[in-house]
UniProtKB/Swiss-Prot annotation:
Subunit structure: Heterohexadecamer of 8 large and 8 small subunits.
Domain of life assignment: Eukaryota
Record keywords: Calvin cycle, Carbon dioxide fixation, Chloroplast, Photorespiration, Photosynthesis, Plastid, Transit peptide
Protein location: Plastid, Chloroplast
Further details from the record: The basic functional RuBisCO is composed of a large chain homodimer in a 'head-to-tail' conformation. In form I RuBisCO this homodimer is arranged in a barrel-like tetramer with the small subunits forming a tetrameric 'cap' on each end of the 'barrel'.
Keyword Cell cycle part of the UniProt annotation: no
Natural source organism: Flaveria pringlei
Protein name, UniProt field: Ribulose bisphosphate carboxylase small subunit, chloroplastic 6
Biological function: RuBisCO catalyzes two reactions: the carboxylation of D-ribulose 1,5-bisphosphate, the primary event in carbon dioxide fixation, as well as the oxidative fragmentation of the pentose substrate. Both reactions occur simultaneously and in competition at the same active site. Although the small subunit is not catalytic it is essential for maximal activity.
Transit peptide residues according to the UniProt entry: 1-50
Family: Belongs to the RuBisCO small chain family.
Main location as per UniProt: plastid
UniProt-listed SUPFAM superfamilies: RuBisCO, small subunit (SSF55239)
CDD domains in UniProt: RuBisCO_small
Length: 173
């Protein structure tokens, strides 16, 4: 049973809004029919050189960029420059036994892979130059020549890790 005030309110609302009459004709949206002409697309002249990626068998994947060949010192410095430009705090970590995904401390699937890496010194708060990070990397490599070493960039405002990549691997990996 509907009450009288509800009926009156419904009638008043219906009078305030015009009824929907459907979509208007396409005259308001002019459309030109284009012919698919691929002759004007940019081209590199057929000189494509693709980078060879990591072989799918016999090599373990580590983390970001691990499918690429080892990064040179200059390439590592560019990555560090990138994280510094983004105002992230660089930090080095190393692992002596398991540089690849190894579920020892957590068995659940997902982002967290169960590894704990040892931090090399403290995060480099106030670091403004990739040369400083590269010197620390060389120091860590000298101390632990058979370790996996990664460089991490932390955002200290959001308190999250934003970048992580392998900077050094043991021989034979």
């Amino acid at each position: 049973m509907a009450s009288i005030p509800a009926t009156v309110a419904a009638v008043a609302q219906a009078n305030m809004v015009a009824p929907f009459t459907g979509l208007k004709a396409n005259a308001a949206f002019p459309v030109t029919k284009k012919v698919n002409d691929f002759s004007t697309l940019p081209s590199n002249g057929g000189r494509v050189q693709c980078m060879k990626v990591w072989p799918p068998l016999g090599k373990k994947k580590y983390x970001t960029l691990s499918y690429l060949p080892n990064l040179t010192e200059a390439q590592l410095a560019k990555e560090v420059d990138y994280l510094l430009r983004n105002k992230w705090v660089p930090c080095l970590e190393f692992e002596l036994e398991h540089g690849f995904v190894y579920r020892e401390n957590a068995r659940s699937p997902g982002y967290y892979d169960g590894r704990y890496w040892t931090m090399w010194k403290l995060p480099m708060f106030g670091c403004t130059d990739s040369v400083q990070v590269m010197k620390e990397l060389q120091e860590c490599k000298k101390e632990y020549p058979q370790a996996w070493i990664r460089i991490i960039g932390f955002d200290n405002v959001r308190q999250v890790q934003c970048i992580s990549f392998i900077a050094s691997k043991p021989d034979x990996f």
